[in-house]
Amino acid sequence: METIAALTRTENMRNLLLGISALVIVGFSSSSGFALDPMGPPTAGLEQGQFRAGVDYSYSKMDLELTDGTYVEYLDGILFDSGEATSFALKDFKASKAYVNLGYGFADNCEGFLRVGGTKGEFDDSIWVDSEQFDSGNDLAVGGGLKATFFEEGDLKLGVLVQGSWAEHQGQLDSPNWTGPDFVDIDMVEVQMAAGASYTWEGIISVYGGPFFHFVSGDLEDTVGASVTGLGELLNSEYDWEIEEDSTFGGYIGAQLEVAEGCSFNVEYQFTAAANAFGASILWRF
């Protein structure tokens, strides 16, 4: 009877987690906010020599500081003017990412992983404040990281992780008030470092989370569409800013479900003062 009751509790917890995950996915998919990467448990989950493959997805938005800006103007192809561009905050940069995740257990308490996938970004009315909109195409994103467990007692694990990624967003910035679009190229490098805990029930369901550090660096280039002066001359302008995130510290919480032998699904929420994100993964160990 105790075994049946335990199995019933486990099945109920499994159904509850799946239901919560579905609600979270629907909620984020219908919200206005969309570029943090999913982290998963901050502890190693592979044995030595074991492999893992799967899919990661994240949907996030953040505020970015554009600083140390410069501009160059050309008149009929000849240098006309140059100088410093105004620094400002680019609000609600939205990005969705999808990765193929490949992992390997270097030891029972240490694993590494690589990610390759695509990303899509957008923002509204932030550079020129003239009802402009930016929408990138589907661009390349790559990343990788390490996880290590440094304490394990029963179902409780403590560990650390570090991961990084690079993504590019290229597309047009356009406004109904302009005669033609600008062309924007964004390169971003993100680093996340976390320390936290993972606790497992019945060997099937676990919760995890902890504090993390988030660092963003990169640059944004805006090539302004050519315009013709009153004298019939062609004016081209190029702007360039360095990118930083407003906030660097935050926290995250998630849950992981063993949906089948060797297959797990996890869902998580990350937040800082300037960013928030939803992440989900489905992974197979072999």
Which residues does each predicted region cover?
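Outer-membrane beta-barrel biogenesis signature
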Residues: 27-75
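Residues that define the transmembrane beta-barrel architecture of outer-membrane proteins
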Residues: 49, 94-98, 136-142, 185-191, ...
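Transmembrane beta-strands of outer-membrane beta-barrel pores
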Residues: 57-63, 116-122, 148-150, 162-172, ...
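Outer-membrane beta-barrel translocator domains and adjoining extracellular loop/strand segments
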Residues: 64-72, 122-131, 170-180, 219-228, ...
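Solvent-exposed loop/turn segments connecting transmembrane beta-strands
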Residues: 92, 154, 243-247, 266-281
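Repeated loop/turn-to-beta-strand initiation elements of outer-membrane beta-barrel proteins
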Residues: 109-112, 153-158, 204-207, 257-267
